[in-house]
A protein has these predicted regions:
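Short, conserved phosphate/pyrophosphate- and ester-handling motifs at nucleotide-, phospho-/glycolipid
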Residues: 52, 103, 214
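Short beta-strand-loop/turn "lid" adjacent to the catalytic site in phosphate-handling enzymes
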Residues: 70-101, 116-118, 143, 147-168, ...
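Gly-rich Lys/Arg/Thr-decorated short loops/hinges at beta-loop-alpha junctions or inter-strand turns
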Residues: 40-48, 155-161, 184-185, 324-330
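Short, acidic/turn-prone active-site loops that include or flank metal/cofactor-
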Residues: 37, 42, 99-106, 160-162, ...
Length: 448
């Protein structure tokens, strides 16, 4: 094979909950370089979740880009979690905490009744932030802070902006809605379509491109585009999407458009991902969950800071049921991963959609006990994506669009690759099923 021209490389940067990740990728989707810059997830109170936005949203992306050492990259694009918000000064530097999804300062009444991710959370973030820093130069979400740090352009994509409803009405910033929260249009970032050129990265010839929401970036390169394809995003947040032929509403779940024409996705986000599993890892003695006895596993309720889909209950809390003297640290750790798998299965069953295959993506795919628990809990093989940095990979594809190397977003599916397939284990099927039924009863699921 002829060597790939260095001119063909683009870069995707993902501002995540626990780290900024960056990948340099060629036209075939092969990763030539990667970087990960960790940052702290701050929990100043049980119902609060924030970043030091200077560290996580500004310094992290710039450092990650520098670590790749590819100043010749054709373009760079940023993906990020939503919603998020901070106030910035005239130099684009954050001056308030970086508020993150699920923080009580964005709490919206009746969120459980909404068929899409909660509308209004970002607006409540703005209300709090504007009161903390009235007259700030700007009120920006994470991608605007990162893009300004990279290229001096405070810009976000339309999908990110739409999550700010009612602040953004689909055509532009709503002056009246902003005024109600203490802000003006000129304090908000510019909004552009994803995959468009919007600037030049400092110190390079690279074009800055608009990226997109992290989950969207992961989805376009996952290959979960056919009816019954399930995408499980294993990050700090656990996200499950089932591809369906037509949109329909399911109580407790979200329905959103798919990037594939004529398709929709049903599912949602859960706190039973890395946020919960990381806490378990810190408080439970080290042991190998793969060595646990299938008959000696308790049941975790993984609601360490409330739950999103399908309950939308910020006041739920974690609990451990059925602990006895025959169990050990391996049993407790297996129970935690199993709880995450139970959440996946519950969302699949609530959706009522036929399941064809399960594809897992995200940093958690490196954790084999997690992948095994999802396979055991669902009773289905789990296809593990070859590139764990799925959001950064998708952003790199959008960067290609900005410089004319790609024209159709659905072509990103050619970058989908499976590293391994994790099969459910026969000796775990019956005991795991029994615990799943107990999990549903304890959680008050309407599947009982």
């Amino acid at each position: 094979m002829a060597p790939v021209s260095r001119e063909d490389v683009t870069i995707g940067i993902d501002v995540g909950t626990t780290a900024a990740k960056a990948v340099a990728v060629d036209e075939s989707g092969r990763v030539h370089a990667r970087a990960r810059i960790p940052h702290q997830l701050l929990v100043p109170a049980p119902d609060r979740l924030e970043h030091n936005a200077e560290e996580a949203w500004r310094e992290g992306p710039v450092t990650a880009l520098g670590r790749l050492n590819r100043p010749d990259a054709k373009a760079v694009a940023v993906s990020s979690m939503v919603p998020s918000l901070t106030a910035v000064d005239t130099e684009g530097r954050p001056i308030t905490p970086g508020l993150l999804y699920g923080d009580s300062r964005g709490r919206v009444p009746d969120a459980a009744e909404q068929p899409v991710p909660a509308v209004g959370e970002a607006a409540e973030f703005l209300r709090w932030t504007a009161a903390e820093a009235p007259g700030a130069a700007g009120y920006w979400p994470a991608p605007a802070v990162a893009n300004h740090a990279l290229a001096g352009e405070a810009v976000i994509d339309f999908a990110t902006a739409i999550t700010s409803l009612p602040l953004f009405d689909g055509t532009g910033w709503n002056a009246s809605a902003l005024a109600d929260r203490g802000a003006t249009v000129d304090q908000m970032p510019r909004v552009e379509t994803f995959g468009k050129p919007v600037g030049q990265v400092r110190g390079t010839s690279s074009v800055l491109a608009t990226g997109a929401i992290d989950a969207l970036c992961e989805q376009i390169v996952a290959g979960a585009d056919h009816d019954g394809d399930v995408l499980v995003l294993c990050g700090t947040t656990l996200i499950v999407w089932i591809t369906v032929a037509e949109a329909r509403q399911v109580p407790g779940l979200w329905t959103i458009p798919h990037t594939a024409v004529g398709k929709s996705q049903i599912g949602g986000a859960s706190n039973a991902g890395g946020l919960f599993l990381g806490w378990v890892d810190r408080v439970v003695a080290q042991a190998d969950p793969l060595g646990a006895d299938p008959r000696r596993v308790p049941v975790w309720m993984p609601y360490i800071r409330g739950e999103r889909t399908p309950f939308h209950d910020p006041d739920r809390r974690a609990a451990l049921h059925g602990v006895d003297l025959t169990q050990d640290a391996a049993s407790l750790r297996r129970a935690a991963y199993e709880a995450s798998g139970f959440v996946v299965r519950q969302i699949l069953e609530l959706s009522g959609a036929p399941v064809r295959r399960i594809i897992a993506s995200g940093g958690g795919t490196r954790v084999q006990p997690w992948m095994q628990a999802i396979a055991d809990a669902t009773g289905r093989p789990v296809e593990v994506s070859a590139v764990a940095e799925g959001a950064a990979l998708g952003a790199a594809f959008l960067a290609r669009m900005a410089v004319g190397l790609e024209s159709v977003i659905t072509d990103a599916a050619r970058w989908a690759a499976v590293e391994r397939v994790v099969e459910p284990r026969s000796e775990w099927v019956r005991p795991t099923n029994d615990r799943y039924r107990h999990f549903l009863e304890l959680s008050g699921s309407r599947l009982v």
